[in-house]
Amino acid sequence: MTSPMKGLLKGLRYIARIFEDEKEPEMQIGIPTDVKHVAHIGWEGPSATTPSWMHDFKPTDQTKTETKGTSNKKPGSSGEKHRKGRRKTSTGNNSPTESPSRVGGSVRPSKRNTGKQREQNTGSGSESGSGLELPQQTDQFVVPKQSKQKKSKGSATGGGEPPPSNEPSNKKETDISVRAVYPCAGLGSSTGR
């Protein structure tokens, strides 16, 4: 049995050498810097050398004018609305569609920085005192500060006397100033954190 296996292997090696010896002519596609025909289709207008598969498609300039024409005829069926996705456009600085994270025309930072910035705003809110407003606030988000007294634990049982005024309430003032900047902060719990 070893001799037929050797003969089979010799035949396979012979066939493999034939394919190894045959070299196909290498096809040169083009100079690597010559990619205008691929990368810049439609940038300089239609050319005479467009590929045959591109004849079915319209240039981008014609599609823009057609979408403008159809938007004049049928408002609401514009193709541009579909391209923009789910973004909503705001009508003004104090419009209700504008996000509450936008303060004074500045854009909200990324999700990574919001925690750090909130801590900084909390710190600056405690430094600002009780009667000063932060310069970033707009009229829409200004919450008037009122003096709130802490409820004593005895009030739940019916004791009901306010705590003495000499007790420090720095945490409450900080929470109030943070709520003035971020009106949604602390709505879920009374402690704020």
Swiss-Prot record:
Q: Where is the composition biased (Low complexity)?
A: 123-134
> Which cell locations does it reside in?
Cell membrane
Is Transmembrane helix found in the keyword set? no
Membrane-protein topology: Peripheral membrane protein
Q: Gene encoding this polypeptide?
A: RIC5
Q: Which segments show compositional bias classed as Polar residues?
A: 90-100
The reply to whether Zinc figures as a keyword in the UniProt entry is: no
Compositionally biased intervals (Basic and acidic residues): 55-67
Gene Ontology biological process terms, A to Z: pollen tube growth
Secretion signal span: none
What other remark does the UniProt record contain for this protein?
Over-expression of RIC5 in tobacco germinating pollen reduces pollen tube expansion elongation.
In which tissues has expression of this protein been reported? Answer: Expressed in flowers and pollen.
Protein name per Swiss-Prot or TrEMBL: CRIB domain-containing protein RIC5
